[in-house]
Amino acid sequence: MQKKEADPWYREEDESILEIYDIEQGTREVVREFDYLIEAPNWSMDGTCLFYNSNGRIFRLDLATKETSEIFSDFVTNCNNDHVLSPDGQSIAVSHGTKEDGKSRIYTLPLSGGVPRLITPMAPSYLHGWSPDGKTLAYCAERDGEYDIYTIPVEGGEERRLTYAEGLNDGPEYDPAGSEIWFNSVRTGLMQAWRMKSDGSEQTQMTCDEEWNTWFPHVSPDGKNVVMLSYRKGDLKPAEHLPHKHVELRLMPAAGGEVKTVVELFGGQGTINVNSWSPDSKKFAFVSYRIRGEN
């Protein structure tokens, strides 16, 4: 078995710390620690639970009791860290590596558990956004060797390509109004946050950091703020999104403006891949990591 020194993706010795950051108080709160890998929290629409993936499954954590329970997903047992809750809080869409070829495809299922429904037969497809009206999913997909952003009706059907720029375009997520999609793109050299209309028009660069590669811009429910994950330039290639890095969570106004660091942590992949804002827009959840046996 490869150890972490030889394989940057070796994570069997990861321990996970599920945390919440309060943007008004500027404080971090540890929700619960795990002696294994968990990733990518989503905050429930009623504010009572967090949902995360671990070992290919989706779990619910009750914020009052800190108890966890697995969401029954039948044959979908290889979920990655790209999953999103529906706007009505009744369903979850997940990205699952199918047994046939191991490639990620998007499925939806009841949040209470149930038999998943395949949405994207074409693969790989990695989910990131669900439109506020509940009708459309947005995702990153590799087609003919290019990773771009696509949308598809939530019931399935014909997918629509929104980006054509060379290089990785990833992490599409709707703003609360549903009129715009935030995403990250490497098209200008480093990974940066971008915004476009929901039909793919008016693609606009929102960060112009010369020292950072910025991933996964998540818009708060009130539409005022965006939290992003940033790697320092030189720590990896611009299109890489690795674990086991010293990274920063950074906040900026959704209208554009100064970007400020609010959290420094050890993590990266799995820390905040999907939207994790609380319904009141005052907090967001994330995962930091440590390697077992290391301080």
Q: Could you say what each language-model-derived stretch is?
A:
Residues M1-N295:
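Sequence signature of WD/YWTD-type beta-propeller architectures
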